[in-house]
Amino acid sequence: ISACLVGSEMCIRDSYNYEEELMIKIAWYYYIENLTQQEIAKILGINRIKILRLLDKAKENGLITFQIRNSNAKRFHMENTFKELFHLNDILIIPSVPSSDSLNDSLAQAASMYINQRIKENSYINMGYGDTPSRILNYLAQRSESPINVISLTGGVNYYLPNTESNVFNARLHLIPCPLILSSSFIMEELKKETAIQRISKMALISDFTVVGIGGVDTNATIIKNSILTPDDYLLLKKQGAVGDILSHFIDINGNLIDTDLEKRLMSPALTDIEKYNNVVGVAGGPHKIEAIYAVLTGKYLDVLITDENTATAVLDLYQSKNNIDTERKDGALQ
């Protein structure tokens, strides 16, 4: 008996249906790729009992039938393509939504669900600077059944504080108590010598997950909207080839660091230190982030990417053009 998947066309309204997407993915591996439940558990980072429960639920809900719904199959093919091209451990592609604010919120919800499925009691999670990581933190702290420990990777405390509208915030915060960008390199170096900051830096190395946003080089970027950098700073960065940032380090299209005076005053881990962290999850989407996401992937800074379908398609198109690939796309995958 052959079995395939059917999922109703999913769109994000009040929340992203992460469990349904997970059921589809498990059913695909089990029925289409003939993997064992133990193999699927290892790939997805969840236990075998949960795999069995979700397979049963998928049958009850009618997600397992005799057809593959094109929208879900396309995303799944695209996810596999990203893993192969950019050497990712995992990727989650959600349906796209019209506005950038709705997209950021949908991505934040999806990321919080993804991480919440994989963390244990009293887990430690590193958080980068920015609007999307801040939203993820608030959703995660509300969803987590047991307290989580959140480590700030950068200065700029405001983005690590709970949203005042949250009724529940189940997280212990370990913050670097200083601005994101200091007035001088001397002050930055002296602060890094402080025992409290060194303790936080050491905690970051043993955290279970590391969550980072990916910034574009445009006037809507968090770092410029908050007047941390001026429009003139951005123009200069663009002239130097910057297409985006990760942990507030600006990089070119190939993922190389743009070395400026800003680097000497930035309270953030060195770009070369990112590979020392466990399970680095990058979360970003939207047309203004395409080059930035491509650059971060090319630089091999991520273990996991969470983005939306339109952005993922555009990043693959950019990969094709940069690598002079003249191929047809079938179901979201490069052939």
Language-model regions, residue ranges each:
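Short, surface-exposed alpha-helical recognition segments that flank or form part
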Residues: D14, S99-L103, A284
